[in-house]
Amino acid sequence: MNSMNILNKVKNVKSYTRLVRQGFLSQQRNHSVSVNEVDHFNELAKTWWDWDGGSRLLHLMNSTRLDFMTEVFRERNCFSGKKILDIGCGGGILSESMARLGASVTAVDASPMAIEVAKKHASLDPVLNGRLEYIHGSVEGSQLPTTFDVVTCMEVLEHVEQPRDFLFSLMEKVKPNGRLVLSTISRTLLARLLTITLAEHVLRIVPVGTHTFEKFIRADELSNFLKEQNWIINDIRGVCYNPLKQQWTLDKPGSSGLGLSCNYFLSAQKPMSA
């Protein structure tokens, strides 16, 4: 069964202050999954592995994600033997890559259509047998009895209803001294211009309605939240997309460029005493 057959078979807060009050500052642990967001990504699922479809930017970003993780881990063959949990895996773009690099990956997504696409695509590659497990669900609701060396959650935070609660759920799945690797979008006017106005409405390289500005979280807000929980920030870097070259560029360590004003990656380490 080829990729086209798979794709054809699967069918597809008024202000940030209010969002923060409901999310980061709320002590109530609520479910983070948004029905509207799940419906949106169910629609995108049918083109997840189409390089010219709505997930094209994620395909182009994937090697940059792996580069960031490799630099942060500072280990040779850094994925080999690692137990990794990939939350919000979508169709499995990152999950498959990490499994091919030697990790044992458990991948979870709230979209049933995305998980169906991911399973069928992974079945095409025998190398992934025994290395990659897909689960339909959420980090709060999925039966995950163990903790992991690494938890990844890429391009997901900007889509959840309760970011604070969601982050706590992610953090619980990381073993002591393990890593949490995140990527999301900063809540700045530049990010709004680039990710919503330009990417969605002008260039149409991202489906309209994919992003909600009020859900974006600034890099300093996210890093400060993690520090308050006594986590160590290993690295935080911006990543910029050049539509002319059609490529993503990762900021150099310590860079104070414009990258953190839009898309950014963050790696944090759980304290041993946690």
From Swiss-Prot:
O-methyltransferase required for two non-consecutive steps during ubiquinone biosynthesis. Catalyzes the 2 O-methylation of 3,4-dihydroxy-5-(all-trans-decaprenyl)benzoic acid into 4-hydroxy-3-methoxy-5-(all-trans-decaprenyl)benzoic acid. Also catalyzes the last step of ubiquinone biosynthesis by mediating methylation of 3-demethylubiquinone into ubiquinone. Also able to mediate the methylation of 3-demethylubiquinol-10 into ubiquinol-10. It comes from Schizosaccharomyces pombe (strain 972 / ATCC 24843) (Fission yeast). S-adenosyl-L-methionine binds at residues 65, 88, 109, 154. It is found in: Mitochondrion inner membrane. Belongs to the class I-like SAM-binding methyltransferase superfamily. UbiG/COQ3 family. The keyword Transferase applies. Mg(2+) binds at residues 155, 158-159. Pathway: Cofactor biosynthesis; ubiquinone biosynthesis. One of its GO terms (cellular component) is extrinsic component of mitochondrial inner membrane. Its EC number is 2.1.1.64, 2.1.1.-, 2.1.1.114. It catalyses: 3,4-dihydroxy-5-(all-trans-decaprenyl)benzoate + S-adenosyl-L-methionine = 4-hydroxy-3-methoxy-5-(all-trans-decaprenyl)benzoate + S-adenosyl-L-homocysteine + H(+); a 3-demethylubiquinone + S-adenosyl-L-methionine = a ubiquinone + S-adenosyl-L-homocysteine; 3-demethylubiquinol-10 + S-adenosyl-L-methionine = ubiquinol-10 + S-adenosyl-L-homocysteine + H(+). InterPro entries: SAM-dependent_MTases_sf (IPR029063), UbiG_MeTrfase (IPR010233). It is an enzyme of class 2 (transferase). This is Ubiquinone biosynthesis O-methyltransferase, mitochondrial. It comes from the Eukaryota. Residues 1-30 form a transit peptide. The keyword Mitochondrion applies. Component of a multi-subunit COQ enzyme complex, composed of at least coq3, coq4, coq5, coq6, coq7 and coq9. Pfam families: Methyltransf_23. It is a peripheral membrane protein. Disruption phenotype: Leads to respiration deficiency. Its cofactor is Mg(2+). Keywords: Magnesium, Membrane, Metal-binding, Methyltransferase, Mitochondrion, Mitochondrion inner membrane, S-adenosyl-L-methionine, Transferase, Transit peptide, Ubiquinone biosynthesis. GO terms for molecular function: 3-demethylubiquinol 3-O-methyltransferase activity; 3-demethylubiquinone 3-O-methyltransferase activity; polyprenyldihydroxybenzoate methyltransferase activity.
